[in-house]
């Protein structure tokens, strides 16, 4: 009777009188385990002595009322068996076989239950009529408890009838007596709370204090609060202790209660709903709460001293629980290895096993006290130790029960304790150690309902603690360790602890447990442990994410849990490593199994060890085990195990999911606790809201608190919840509570809220114990799940959209063969299975691999985005490392039919060929999903990141990183990580990662978005990262596409003309330019990234349509914008995003190509990225993720200013890649180029660049960096210098170029400017040479080019041998390139040309030749152009020129190149593009070109936009007309010209060479170009180069490049005319249109007029863009028209024309200029207004690019473009096309696209100056360029007047004007 004494002592200590004590009656049998849940209320648990016995006793009862008869003796075995069996109640099961013996002995000792009483109970249970027999069968089958009023005559035997009549005679005037029969499953909780006394006039007697809402008892109306229980199965209980009563009630499956009720309350004997509604129930719960934790504590303490009893308690409890609950509940079992281990641990702890095994704990859940209870408890909460436990208990019914009688430990009442304790204490004890050991089991353990609810954590913790407490003596630290390790390990967090601290043991966690145990002051006796645990948890683990786990685990978990939490925290890395998909480690798994088996055995022992000695033994066993095989429990092992198992996070998630799942249904399930649950939930919610206070008042609170701590941890509250959830999952009640909380709190995401909606909704019976306990880690009560099988194909109903939260709990009965025999045969063998979830045959998610034979616990949750989906398929595959995975089972659910009925479902899905998969689903409709109401942060009370305003987040983050792009760090980090890991992952953005892990990651981001570890070691599943990114976008208070702007885009899409792709793209991009700064930058950043993803669609299977389907709604949908009553239209955002992705540049393809070329040349690229611009892009692309491989996009760039250049390089590469992508569309290219300059413009804000401009910028940066090295490394630099017209000319030479532009020259201005910041001069120098060299070096194909070059060069030879050589080389390069990449041959040539133009580039291409060219200023300039072109081409090719990106690239890139290394960049791109374009032209697919150009434009726009909100882009949009009017015919061209002109003016000759190269080139180049051009785009450029050579081969070269760009922008096939115009820019086209005018014309099918004009200036025209300043001019104009059409080319040319000789250098630019203008327009969408002009203008952006390109080369040229662009963008242009560095000024301006958009640009600039980090840079460039631009502009104006006309609208007069304005603005 020690226990009994102890119990009394506890009672005394707690000061809880019997009256105050309330017991949760009847274990929850719903679970199929004997859950003394009801009994197991915290109060109950306290009676230590009893509980232990109680537990077993209860276990027996629960386990099997019938098993019980097997005899207490059997209980010993039974317990073990039950554990094993996992079927019957945890305790009872355990007690099952040996029930009688064990239970009796134990009960006798612990409680006053004698063998006679047991026999009586059994007799009544077995002596029943047919009705009852049918009811028993029904219950077994369905799991639903049956409650009915029984007539005495139905009692069976005569004896029984007589006894019943005697009881009936106790009725009097005020009371009626009736018999109520309750038929339940063995471990099922009744959902009753009982107390001593009625709280009024009686202090003795057993009264029902409350009934769980929605429970079977509640719904039956047969029992009501305040009824007195006279007898249970005819055993008089009026004088028994509550614990004994609880135990008695939990033993049998058939309970016959003799109830005395007040008359009138319910009507005389009328059972019924009235009771249900009676308010009476609630007060009792409160009372229940009152019970002191101390009792439990004492009990626990007692237990400590008497391990046996605690073990007993645990055992009965734990054992059963272990099987079912542990398996099911915690999900430990889920992880088979882990769970095995855990199980073992669990079992090892005698008590623990019992507790865990206690499926009834689920039942117990129902008991969790209602909020009132919780409320009360909270009051107690203050006393930490006691109150903590109290809290935990208080929170739930369970806790209430605990209080009533130390259910857990069974401290107060012997009998109740068994079950109760089993739930609470047992769970607590064993749970602690064992729970920890196997957290999942702990969940089962935790099945204590109360624990499950909120108490769950408490309970779990409690259990664990209890166990640990119990064990501490017995198991000592080791067991604790194991427990912790097991449980936590499972979670990952616990893992560490386990290793570090023995859970129970004295070790910190253990110590706490022990301490707690020693201090009976805890409110719950059983819970004590939990209490202590939780308290420790709080203290100890408060901080750790585990906190939530602890909370999940409950007090017990607390100690262990807390410790484990700490461990988890410590092992956060492990946790972080959780991989939802990764398979559990085999070794671990085996180990896990071994341990689990051991645990189970131990557990069984536990069952056995109802007796204290057993308990001790068990503890000993556990300890021994641990000690003996420390490895099993080592932290590392656990960690590994964890890893293998879903991760801690997965487990947590699993638990949480289960908990959620159960929680929803559990409302009913825990009938007793149902009402409590609601209260608890409410309480929890409040707690949740104030997550900060870890120790919630109630159990729930406590859980919440723990959760909160977790949130403090890296994981977010939800995650923590999940972690806590592990335990909670085990305990349905708690789980349910938690789930509800989750639902209500919705941690964070709308998806999170999904749960909240139906948290309490589906009352499901407790988890069933039907599945064999041994295999079940998750306790599943089939009765809670609706059987579902999709027989008929889905009728054609509308699909379902929104978010579907789906929790895949487990698979049961997954037999390998149809026949049972086969199944049994394979039962022994384990298989590795994983689940795949598909929606309408599209793969959406997959779970981790689980091992088992028939039972598999995946316990993972996912949040699936639904867009009109109708069917959900669950496919189970066998995992095989060697062979193809085999589909083993499949089941389908009709979403459209099932979700229309209700958003919440718990389904037992029948799968073929046989088996069942248990699933919980919660649907959130689109209106709720896209309400975009931010969830307040727990700390701040308002959303700090997720759900916070974009501008606010960006402004806050920019304080720490001034100058960084206005893109939220969370997006940047996620995108960088995705690109770093590769964009070839199948299903990127479509697949969902584990919802739990996602929440953990969200928590981490909320805490510190910069410090989050996203490495594969921490976040193995990339889909978790993409899920966080989507959640962030979905939760923005306002969509990234603002509502009005989204409507505009939808309208624009509706009016798009099929035959005007370019205009369509311009229009769309112009709209995007209206976005607010942060939105625009972020959108451009994302579109750059998404275009990369789409560019890898062959490998990642994510086409533009697929990606738009996933990303469109989060980016654009807003519930407020939907018509009231109407469904949200998902088709519009999908169509808009798809269109944007189609017109956006796709850097990746190019990247890849580049990568190929750059692969070997990575060093070369860096060292000799003379073709930096092009190469850069390529380089970026090479990595295959926007240069991510280099890390351009990574935060590294922003992070390391020192490495800024490198970063920039990388970025440039990325940009380049984007350019390649762009190449498909001219405008896109332009965008890219613009973007580059923009980025460069913000050179100062390296961070910003890296961020926003990452893609584009990186591209440019890469170019720049690459170029630099290249220059440094070789003559490439020399070429660049030329580009810087006058200043460099002196250097002409590579050295100068390299030096001055060295950094950024080639790729983008000066390195430091990084393209954008570079001073105009720098830019100039950089202008052509650098870039070209970069590309060359990257290409590494220069030699072949060289070979070809000679041939091509022949034409250019005219200029200068050197130049011609250069030209030749260029030409060669082009040809070679072509050979290399047929697609891009032309482009390549052009690019080569450009490269050649750049002497240094040339050199790179062909060292000697380059040098040669370098020597001659002119020559070097041309070479520059050539090099640029060549390099561009090669780069491009490498980049995958052939892609449309090439075209776009050409334009854009040309622009970029121009900007970066003017000629090089733009030319390079140009070259490639030109090729493409040429082919397009040939094919006469103007439309295609146009479309491409359109795409390009969009990309460009975006790019630009992104990079810096480019002035150009906006301007055109804003005042396309303005520019147009000003420039109307001329202005624009002039603008373009401007760029060129200055060059010409500026260094006519030298300038020509450099920037003015074009000019020089103009004359001679022209013819040369023509030839070249004709030959090859690049060659033409080469020619130009040659011509330029004469005067400035460069110019020519450049021009061709430019031309090429335009042309290249196959985007603008239609821009072909541009090509024509390019002709004029022969130089630019030059490359493309080798022949100046003619070629240009030819090249551009663009415009004949251009052609004509071009032709006439052909050489020059082409040159115009290029070097042909004068000729160029005329040509330009002509071209302008064509160009305008072409956009890139035309403008470029036209502008090029502006060529102003400048054209020479700008020629490429020029081309670009023209293009730029066109592009600009295009970009802006304004251009369309102007029609042809518009086209040109659009391209103009590109042209501008070119122009600025030119500019770089020649200030003037650059300026012209620049001015035009500049004005618009102001710096934007410039920096954008810094890239063009060559034409620094121009660069800036060109970017502005300003030629025609000049005004707008200016405006834009002014507008966005503040916004644009790069503005200053712009200014700088513009300033320089400004002047030049002016000069050029004028020149351009002259020449380009007609061109202006063409581009008029674009550059329009503006160009000139714009230039001036721009300057002024500057």
Swiss-Prot record:
Site residues by UniProt (Arginine finger): 990
Ranges of biased composition (kind: Pro residues): 271-286, 1282-1292
Biased composition (Basic and acidic residues): 301-326, 1830-1839
Annotated effect of mutating residue 190 to A: Reduced interaction with Nrx-1
Bias kind Low complexity: ranges: 59-77, 1293-1302, 1443-1479, 1590-1607, 1644-1658, 1671-1688, 1696-1720
Molecular function GO labels: GTPase activator activity
Keyword presence, Zinc: no
Annotated Gene Ontology cellular component terms: cell projection; neuromuscular junction; presynaptic active zone; presynaptic active zone cytoplasmic component; synaptic membrane
InterPro entries: C2_dom, C2_domain_sf, PDZ, PDZ_sf, Rho-GAP_regulator, Rho_GTPase_activation_prot, RhoGAP_dom
Segments forming domain Rho-GAP: 948-1148
Location relative to the cell: Presynapse
Polar residues bias locations: 750-760, 1356-1377, 1393-1408, 1416-1429, 1538-1587
Biological processes annotated in GO: activation of GTPase activity; axon extension involved in axon guidance; cell migration; cell projection organization; cytoskeletal matrix organization at active zone; maintenance of presynaptic active zone structure; presynaptic active zone organization; R7 cell development
Primary site of residence: other
Phenotype reported upon loss of the gene: Reduced synpatic bouton numbers in neuromuscular junctions (NMJs). Defects in the organization of the remaining active zones in NMJs. Reduced Nrx-1 and Nlg-1 levels at presynapse. Deficit in early GluRIIA incorporation in postsynpase assembly.
SMART domains: C2, PDZ, RhoGAP
Alphabetically ordered keywords of this record: Cell projection, GTPase activation, Phosphoprotein, Synapse
Region Disordered, residue ranges: 22-98, 262-336, 466-530, 745-775, 1273-1328, 1356-1380, 1393-1479, 1514-1607, 1644-1727, 1819-1840
Residues bearing the modification Phosphoserine: 719
Effect on the protein of changing residue 185 to A: Reduced interaction with Nrx-1
PDZ domain residues: 179-264
Superkingdom, taxonomy of origin: Eukaryota
Residue ranges with Gly residues bias: 1659-1670
The protein's assembly and partners: Interacts (via PDZ domain) with Nrx-1; may recruit Nrx-1 to the presynaptic active zone.
Biological function: GTPase activator for the Rho-type GTPases by converting them to an inactive GDP-bound state. Promotes the anchoring of Liprin-alpha clusters at synapses. Recruits and keeps Nrx-1 levels high in active zones in the presynapse opposite the postsynaptic region.
This protein's name: Rho GTPase-activating protein 100F
């Amino acid at each position: 009777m020690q226990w009994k004494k102890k119990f009394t002592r506890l009672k005394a200590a707690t000061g809880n009188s019997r009256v105050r004590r309330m017991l949760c009656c009847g274990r929850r049998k719903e679970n199929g385990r004997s859950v003394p849940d009801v009994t197991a209320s915290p109060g109950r648990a306290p009676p230590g002595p009893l509980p232990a016995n109680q537990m077993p006793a209860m276990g027996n009862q629960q386990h099997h009322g019938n098993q019980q008869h097997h005899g207490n003796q059997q209980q010993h075995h039974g317990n073990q068996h039950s554990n094993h069996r996992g079927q019957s109640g945890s305790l009872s099961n355990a007690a099952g076989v040996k029930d009688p013996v064990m239970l009796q002995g134990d009960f006798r000792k612990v409680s006053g239950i004698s063998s006679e009483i047991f026999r009586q109970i059994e007799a009544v249970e077995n002596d029943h009529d047919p009705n009852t027999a049918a009811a028993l069968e029904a219950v077994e089958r369905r799991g639903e408890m049956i409650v009915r009023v029984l007539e005495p005559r139905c009692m069976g035997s005569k004896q029984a009838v007589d006894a019943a009549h005697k009881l009936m005679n106790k009725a009097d005037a005020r009371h009626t007596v009736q018999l109520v029969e309750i038929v339940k499953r063995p471990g099922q909780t009744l959902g009753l709370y009982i107390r001593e006394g009625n709280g009024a006039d009686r202090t003795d007697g057993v009264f029902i204090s409350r009934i769980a809402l929605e429970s079977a008892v509640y719904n039956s109306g047969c029992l009501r609060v305040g009824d007195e229980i006279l007898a249970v199965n005819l055993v008089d209980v009026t004088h028994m202790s509550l614990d004994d009563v609880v135990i008695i009630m939990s033993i049998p499956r058939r309970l016959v209660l003799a109830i005395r009720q007040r008359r009138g309350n319910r009507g005389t004997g009328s059972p019924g709903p009235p009771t249900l509604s009676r308010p009476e129930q609630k007060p009792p719960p409160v009372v229940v709460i009152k019970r002191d934790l101390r009792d439990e504590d004492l009990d626990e303490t007692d237990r400590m001293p008497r391990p046996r009893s605690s073990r007993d308690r645990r055992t009965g409890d734990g054992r059963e629980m272990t099987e079912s609950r542990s398996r099911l509940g915690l999900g430990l079992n889920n992880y088979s290895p882990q769970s095995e281990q855990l199980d073992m641990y669990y079992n090892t702890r005698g008590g623990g096993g019992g507790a865990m095994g206690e499926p009834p704990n689920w039942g117990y859940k129902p008991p969790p006290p209602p909020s009132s209870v919780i409320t009360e408890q909270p009051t107690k909460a203050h006393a930490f130790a006691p109150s903590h436990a109290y809290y935990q208990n208080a929170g739930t019914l369970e806790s209430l029960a605990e209080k009533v009688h130390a259910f857990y430990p069974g401290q107060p009442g012997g009998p109740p304790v068994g079950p109760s304790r089993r739930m609470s204490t047992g769970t607590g004890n064993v749970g602690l150690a064992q729970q920890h050991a196997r957290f999942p089991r702990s969940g089962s353990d935790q099945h204590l309902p109360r624990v499950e609810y909120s108490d769950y954590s408490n309970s779990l913790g409690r259990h664990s603690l209890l166990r640990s407490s119990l064990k501490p003596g017995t198991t000592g630290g080791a067991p604790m360790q194991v427990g912790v390790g097991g449980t936590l390990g499972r979670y990952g967090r616990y893992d560490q602890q386990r290793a570090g601290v023995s859970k129970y043991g004295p070790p910190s966690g253990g110590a706490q447990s022990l301490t707690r145990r020693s201090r009976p002051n805890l409110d719950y006796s059983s819970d004590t442990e939990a209490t202590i645990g939780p308290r420790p948890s709080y203290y100890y683990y408060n901080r750790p994410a585990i906190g939530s786990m602890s909370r999940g685990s409950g007090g017990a978990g607390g100690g262990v849990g807390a410790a484990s939490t700490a461990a988890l925290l410590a092992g956060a890395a492990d946790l972080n490593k959780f991989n939802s998909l990764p398979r559990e480690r085999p070794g671990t798994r085996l180990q896990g199994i071994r341990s689990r088996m051991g645990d189970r055995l131990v557990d069984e022992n536990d069952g056995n060890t109802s007796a204290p000695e057993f308990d001790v033994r068990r503890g000993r066993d556990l300890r021994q085990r641990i000690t003996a095989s420390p490895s099993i429990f080592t932290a590392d092992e656990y960690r590994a195990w964890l890893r293998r198992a879903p991760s801690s996070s997965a487990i947590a998630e699993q638990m949480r999911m289960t908990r959620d799942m159960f929680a929803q249904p559990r409302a009913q399930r825990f009938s007793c606790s149902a009402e409590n649950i609601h209260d608890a939930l409410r309480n929890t919610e409040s707690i949740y809201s104030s997550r900060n206070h870890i120790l919630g008042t109630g159990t729930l609170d406590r859980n919440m608190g723990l959760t909160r701590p977790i949130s403090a941890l890296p994981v977010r509250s939800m995650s923590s919840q999940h972690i806590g959830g592990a335990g909670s999952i085990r305990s349905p009640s708690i789980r349910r509570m938690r789930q509800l909380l989750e639902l209500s709190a919705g941690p964070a995401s709308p998806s999170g809220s999904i749960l909240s909606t139906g948290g309490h909704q589906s009352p499901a019976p407790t988890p069933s114990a039907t599945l064999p306990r041994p295999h079940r880690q998750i306790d599943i009560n089939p009765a809670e799940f609706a059987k579902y099988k999709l027989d008929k194909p889905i009728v054609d109903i509308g699909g379902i959209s929104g978010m579907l939260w789906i929790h895949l709990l487990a698979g049961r009965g997954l037999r390998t063969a149809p026949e049972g025999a086969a199944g049994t045969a394979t039962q022994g063998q384990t298989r590795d299975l994983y689940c795949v979830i598909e929606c309408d045959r599209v793969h959406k998610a997959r779970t981790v691999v689980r091992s088992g034979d028939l039972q598999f616990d995946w316990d993972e949750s996912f949040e699936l985005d639904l867009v009109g989906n109708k069917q959900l398929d669950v496919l189970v595959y066998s995992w095989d490392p060697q062979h193809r995975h085999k589909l083993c089972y499949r089941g389908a659910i009709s979403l459209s039919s099932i979700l229309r009925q209700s958003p919440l479902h718990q389904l037992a899905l029948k799968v073929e060929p046989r088996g069942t998969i248990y699933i919980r689903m919660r649907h959130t409709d689109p209106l709720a999903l896209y309400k975009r109401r931010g969830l307040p942060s727990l700390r701040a009370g308002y959303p700090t990141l997720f759900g916070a305003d974009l501008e606010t987040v960006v402004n806050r983050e920019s304080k720490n990183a001034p100058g960084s792009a206005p893109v939220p760090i969370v997006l940047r980090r996620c995108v960088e990580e995705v690109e770093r890991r590769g964009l070839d992952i199948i299903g990127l953005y479509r697949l969902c990662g584990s919802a739990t892990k996602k929440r953990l990651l969200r928590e981490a981001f909320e805490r510190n978005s910069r410090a989050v570890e996203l490495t594969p070691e921490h976040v193995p599943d990339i889909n978790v990262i993409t899920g966080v990114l989507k959640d962030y976008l979905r939760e923005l208070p306002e969509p990234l596409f603002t509502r009005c702007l989204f409507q505009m885009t939808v309208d624009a899409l509706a009016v798009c003309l099929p035959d005007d792709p370019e205009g369509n793209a311009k229009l769309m991009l112009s709209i995007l330019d209206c976005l607010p700064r942060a939105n625009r930058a972020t959108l451009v950043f994302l579109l750059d990234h998404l275009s990369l993803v789409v560019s890898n669609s062959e490998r990642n299977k994510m086409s533009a349509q697929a990606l738009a389907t996933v990303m469109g709604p989060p980016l654009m949908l807003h519930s407020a914008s939907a018509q009231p009553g109407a469904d949200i239209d998902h088709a519009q955002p999908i169509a808009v995003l798809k269109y944007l992705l189609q017109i956006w540049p796709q850097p990746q393809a190019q990247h890849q190509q580049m990568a190929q070329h750059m692969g070997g040349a990575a060093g070369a690229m860096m060292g000799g990225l003379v073709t930096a611009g092009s190469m850069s892009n390529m380089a970026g692309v090479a990595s295959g993720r926007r240069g991510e491989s280099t890390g351009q996009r990574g935060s590294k760039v922003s992070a390391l200013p020192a490495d800024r250049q490198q970063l920039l390089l990388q970025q440039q590469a990325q940009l380049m890649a984007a350019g390649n992508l762009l190449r498909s569309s001219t405008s896109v290219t332009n965008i890219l180029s613009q973007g580059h300059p923009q980025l460069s413009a913000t050179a100062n804000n390296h961070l910003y660049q890296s961020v926003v401009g990452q893609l584009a910028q990186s591209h440019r940066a890469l170019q720049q960096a690459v170029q630099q090295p290249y220059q440094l490394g070789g003559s490439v630099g020399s070429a660049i210098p030329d580009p810087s017209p006058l200043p460099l000319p002196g250097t002409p030479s590579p050295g100068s170029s390299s030096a001055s532009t060295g950094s950024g020259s080639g790729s983008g201005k000066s390195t430091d400017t990084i393209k954008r910041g570079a001073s105009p001069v720098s830019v100039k120098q950089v202008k052509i040479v650098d870039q070209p060299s970069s590309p060359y070096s990257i290409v590494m194909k220069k030699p072949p080019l060289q070979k070809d070059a000679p041939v091509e060069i022949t034409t250019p030879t005219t200029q200068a041998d050197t130049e011609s050589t250069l030209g030749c080389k260029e030409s060669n390069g082009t040809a070679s390139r072509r050979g290399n990449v047929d697609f891009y041959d032309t482009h390549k040539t052009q690019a080569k040309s450009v490269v050649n133009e750049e002497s240094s580039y040339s050199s790179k291409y062909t060292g000697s030749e380059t040098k040669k060219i370098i020597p001659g200023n002119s020559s070097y300039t041309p070479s520059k152009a050539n090099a640029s072109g060549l390099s561009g081409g090669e780069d491009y090719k490498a980049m995958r020129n052939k892609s449309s990106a090439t075209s776009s690239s050409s334009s854009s890139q040309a622009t970029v190149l121009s900007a970066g290394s003017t000629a090089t960049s733009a030319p390079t791109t140009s070259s490639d593009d030109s090729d493409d374009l040429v082919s397009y032209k040939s094919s006469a697919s103007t439309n295609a070109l146009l479309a491409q150009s359109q795409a390009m434009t969009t990309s460009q726009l975006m790019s630009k936009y992104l990079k810096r909100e480019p002035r150009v882009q906006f301007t055109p949009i804003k005042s396309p007309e303005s520019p147009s009017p000003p420039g109307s015919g001329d202005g624009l061209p002039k603008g373009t010209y401007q760029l060129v002109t200055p060059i010409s003016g500026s260094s006519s000759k030298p300038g020509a060479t450099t920037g003015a190269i074009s000019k020089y080139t103009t004359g001679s180049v022209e013819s040369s170009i023509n030839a070249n051009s004709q030959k090859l785009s690049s060659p033409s450029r080469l020619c130009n180069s040659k011509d330029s050579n004469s005067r400035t081969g460069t110019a020519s070269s450049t021009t061709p490049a430019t031309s090429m760009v335009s042309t290249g922008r196959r985007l603008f096939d239609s821009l072909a005319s541009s090509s024509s115009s390019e002709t004029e820019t022969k130089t630019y086209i030059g490359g493309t249109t080798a022949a100046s005018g003619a070629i240009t014309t030819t090249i551009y099918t663009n415009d004949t007029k251009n052609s004509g004009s071009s032709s006439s200036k052909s050489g020059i025209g082409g040159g115009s863009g290029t070097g042909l300043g004068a000729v160029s001019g005329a040509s330009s104009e002509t071209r302008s028209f064509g160009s305008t059409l072409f956009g890139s080319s035309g403008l470029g040319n036209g502008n090029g024309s502006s060529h102003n000789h400048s054209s020479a250098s700008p020629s490429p630019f020029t081309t670009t200029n023209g293009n730029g203008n066109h592009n600009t327009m295009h970009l802006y969408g304004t251009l369309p207004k102007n029609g042809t002009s518009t086209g040109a203008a659009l391209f103009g952006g590109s042209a501008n690019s070119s122009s600025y390109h030119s500019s770089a080369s020649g200030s003037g040229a650059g300026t012209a473009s620049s001015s035009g662009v500049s004005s618009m963008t102001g710096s934007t242009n410039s920096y954008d096309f810094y890239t063009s560095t060559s034409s620094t000024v121009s660069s800036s301006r060109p970017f502005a696209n300003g030629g025609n958009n000049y005004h707008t640009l200016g405006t834009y600039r002014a507008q966005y100056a503040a916004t644009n980090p790069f503005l200053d840079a712009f200014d700088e460039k513009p300033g320089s360029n400004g002047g030049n631009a002016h000069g050029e502009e004028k020149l351009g104006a002259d020449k380009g007047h007609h061109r202006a006309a063409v581009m008029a609208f674009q550059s329009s007069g503006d160009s000139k004007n714009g230039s001036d304005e721009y300057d002024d603005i500057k």
